[in-house]
Curated annotation (Swiss-Prot):
Known role: ATP-binding RNA helicase involved in the biogenesis of 60S ribosomal subunits and is required for the normal formation of 25S and 5.8S rRNAs.
Acidic residues: bias regions: 511-523
Protein name as annotated: ATP-dependent RNA helicase DBP10
Known catalytic reactions: ATP + H2O = ADP + phosphate + H(+)
Record-linked PANTHER family: ATP-DEPENDENT RNA HELICASE RHLE-RELATED, RNA HELICASE
Lineage of producing organism: Eukaryota, Fungi, Dikarya, Ascomycota, Pezizomycotina
């Protein structure tokens, strides 16, 4: 009988028993080894018979050896799958939260999530620097849900999220609802503009998570005398905007009422010096998390610096857009302009279905200016030139700001004109060009600006217009260059022989080692300095290279792979945080009323009629203008209107006695009556019908007379509607006001009918 060929593959725990079945196994051993690989030093017969070839001589040793091999392989497979899955499974989150993350569409954590979530799960205070769109909302919502897990029957909120605006609070509420599916956590939304009475009911329903703006939350805290000793998790979202909008006093008062054992998270796009002091006072040994991509210029960035006169900036800007970037005029292709009539008639769902383009065009350009007046001027100039432009600045209305940014995100416009304050926190995923119309005064601001392009391995261009006053600032950036080009405009070529040259002392400080071509520059030339950190960018041609072009080329060492990726700086401890925050701190000048870019804004004054002098508007909130103020628990002055007694009136109107305190068990009837009544309750977006009306009086000429009569009798017995105060229409005895109103109604009916009274028959 001819022997069957061996199987080409062996299972993991397979043992060759061919030697025991065939007598001529020794003769054909070499033939078998050609087809398959034999396990080394393993004989099935010796293992079963406890032969001499076994070291430990037993089945237990063989089984243990195979189990160890299986465990090693399973462990390696799990580590590979965890690494491949992106890290959410490796963070120790519960299965319910992982399913919610998958439903949300998160597969791989963003850099800020990957660095922040493990620290938050370790109960450490964190200061995170991240722009809008980087996933920072999920970075603090995911560990919050993991920590709270389920609704607590004990009274007291356990998490507070502070947002600077109503829109951001609604966005955070949406994320909390989506990631909190499958849990019974209660979330409330407390923002200005909503009814205080409804918010009283929401707070009385014992919520677990509070999402609020500082002004309204402080109002409710003072009005309801809230005890915040149960809070364990506090988040200040967009903290730089919180301070910019004037919530410093409210935040100080809220921070004083929180327990010292809380965990505090602070997220901000930038880190001004005032925010650093707040973090030092309110956080315990915080860790600073900031992305490496926001602290250095991308190696894929190409930079060009144009030295122009003050009157040529507008022309240079149009030249860059027309001839360098090749910006198309009008509305981008594929986008149809809608009339006001169509915009009023269309539905939101139809608009989203009609235009599914969620990213800017390949010509998308952002232009940075100094003040909001420059923003309006440049936007009007570019629109007059035929470009499609969006613009935003700090004091722009929130709704208009959202519309302008949305138009640029969806590709309806190619240009976005902004200031540094307005652009803070805005994240555009794909941005081709950045133009510095007004050069920034600090290198950090320059890196923050140009860091919006050349992301994810894509090429990007950064252009800067330099004047005589801003030329020294541009010299710091030009020291990083690897190529420098100098060329002249055609209109100024005839004046080359008669031009005057500036002395080195005027343009460069003593001891500054600059080349001779910088000493020969004049204001009548258009100088272009191109900085390239990588290969030449083929997609943009600045100008044809002239013959007399002076090129200084320096080969820069390639950046390591770990530096090209996104890293994060983690600093623990107060001393380390102060040192790291000193490097990351960046104060942006106000874009409204600044005398010059980079200079602090002068205090706005108003005329005080009582004292006949000018006083600062900054002191209007401390009671100097006549408004009644009270001292809070922290010592800061807050408005006396926060203690208006509306909560006591609401409690008496709803016939509520003493509400349970922090740590006591919640009342089921109280929770059932007031939960889900507002936009942030359990039934967010739905309102419960609570109005009670008594049935109409029975009509003896109708067929359902007896049914109606029975219902009216039940309403009188239960005192529903108009029978609430007893028998009769409203009360058993009518007041003089009721009688007067009834006579007025009767007189109006008589005048309306205008019929003469019937004469008695004689």
């Amino acid at each position: 009988m001819k022997r069957r060929a061996a199987s080409p593959a062996m299972s993991e725990n397979e043992v060759d028993i061919a030697g025991s079945l065939f007598a001529n196994h020794a003769d054909s051993d070499d033939e078998v080894q050609v087809h398959k690989q034999q396990p080394a030093d393993l004989d099935f017969g010796d293992l079963l018979d406890n032969g001499d070839g076994s070291d430990d001589g037993g089945d237990a040793a063989f089984i243990a050896k195979q189990q160890r091999s299986s465990n090693r392989k399973t462990g390696s497979l799990q580590s590979k799958s965890a690494k491949k899955s992106g890290g959410f499974q490796a963070m120790g989150l519960n299965s319910n939260l992982l399913r919610a993350i998958s439903r949300k569409g998160f597969s791989v954590p963003t850099p800020i999530q990957r660095k922040t979530i493990p620290l938050v799960l370790e109960r450490r205070d964190v200061v995170g620097m991240a722009r809008t769109g980087s996933g920072k909302t999920a970075a603090f919502v995911i560990p919050m849900i993991e920590r709270l897990k389920a609704h607590s029957a004990r009274v007291g909120a356990r998490a507070i999220i502070m947002s600077p605006s109503r829109e951001l609070a609604l966005q955070t509420l949406k994320v909390v609802k989506e990631l909190g599916k499958g849990t019974d956590l209660k979330t409330v939304l407390l923002v200005g503009g909503d009814s205080l009475e409804e918010q009283f009911g929401l707070m009385a329903a014992n919520p677990d998570i509070i999402i609020a703006t500082p002004g309204r939350f402080l109002h409710l805290k003072v009005e309801m005398s809230l005890n915040l000793s149960s809070v364990r998790y506090v988040v200040f979202d967009e903290a730089d905007r919180l301070f910019e909008m004037g919530f410093a006093a409210q935040l100080t008062e809220i921070l004083h009422a929180l327990p010292p054992s809380r965990q505090t998270l602070l997220f901000s796009a930038t880190l001004p010096s005032s925010l650093v002091e707040f973090a030092r006072a309110g956080l315990q040994e915080p860790s600073l998390i900031r992305l490496d991509a926001e602290t250095k210029v991308s190696p894929d960035l190409e930079s060009a610096f144009f030295s122009v006169k003050g009157g040529e900036k507008e022309g240079a800007l149009l030249h860059i857009l027309h001839d360098v970037i090749k910006m198309p005029l009008g509305v981008p292709e594929g986008i149809e302009e809608e009339t006001d009539e169509q915009q009023a008639r269309k539905r939101k769902r139809d608009s989203e279905r009609r235009n599914r383009k969620e990213k800017p065009t390949e010509h998308s350009t952002i232009i940075f200016t100094a003040t909001k007046h420059h923003v309006e001027y440049i936007a009007h100039l570019l629109r007059h030139a035929g470009f499609s432009v969006s613009y935003i600045y700090g004091s722009l209305d929130q709704t208009a700001r959202k519309i302008q940014v949305d138009n640029f995100r969806r590709g309806r416009t190619n240009i976005l004109v902004v200031t540094d304050v307005a652009a803070r926190g805005i994240d555009i995923p794909v941005l081709a060009n950045v133009i510095n119309y007004d050069f920034p005064p600090q290198p950090k601001i320059f890196v923050h600006r140009v860091g919006r392009t050349a992301r994810a391995g894509q090429r990007g261009w950064a252009y800067a217009l330099l004047q005589g006053t801003s030329r020294p600032c541009g010299g710091r950036v030009r020291r990083m260059r690897t190529q420098r080009w100098r060329m002249q405009t055609r209109m100024n070529q005839p004046l080359r022989k008669t031009k005057w040259t500036s002395s080195p002392e005027k343009t460069n400080p003593p001891g500054d080692d600059e080349e001779a071509w910088e000493d020969e520059e004049s204001e009548s030339e258009l100088e272009v300095t191109v900085t390239s950190s990588g290969k030449s960018y083929q997609g943009a041609n600045i100008l044809p290279r002239p013959r007399n072009l002076h090129v200084l080329h320096t080969i820069a060492p390639p950046a390591p792979a770990e530096e090209r990726g996104v890293r994060a700086f983690n600093s623990g401890g107060t001393t380390q945080f102060v040192e790291a925050a000193r490097d990351a701190a960046m104060d942006l000048a106000n874009d409204d009323g600044a005398k010059a870019f980079g200079l602090p804004t002068r205090s706005k004054l108003r005329w005080d009629k009582r004292h006949s002098k000018y006083v600062a508007r900054a002191n209007d909130d401390d009671g100097s203008r006549g408004a009644k103020m009270i001292r809070g628990e922290s010592g800061v002055k807050i408005a006396a209107s926060f203690q208006s007694g509306r909560f006591d009136k609401w409690r008496r109107a709803n016939r509520l006695g003493r509400l349970p305190g922090v740590g006591e068990a919640e009342k089921a009837n109280l929770v059932r009556n007031f939960s889900g009544g507002g936009p942030g309750g359990a039934g967010a977006g739905h309102y419960k019908h609570r109005q009670e009306k008594a049935p109409k009086d029975a009509d003896k000429f109708r067929d359902d007379y007896h049914v109606r009569k029975k219902r009216v009798a039940e309403a009188r017995e239960k005192r529903i509607g108009k029978y609430k105060d007893g028998e009769g229409s409203r009360r058993e005895l009518k007041s003089a006001t009721d009688i007067r109103k009834a006579r007025q109604v009767q007189e109006q009916k008589r005048e309306k009918n205008a019929r003469p009274a019937k004469r008695a028959k004689r």
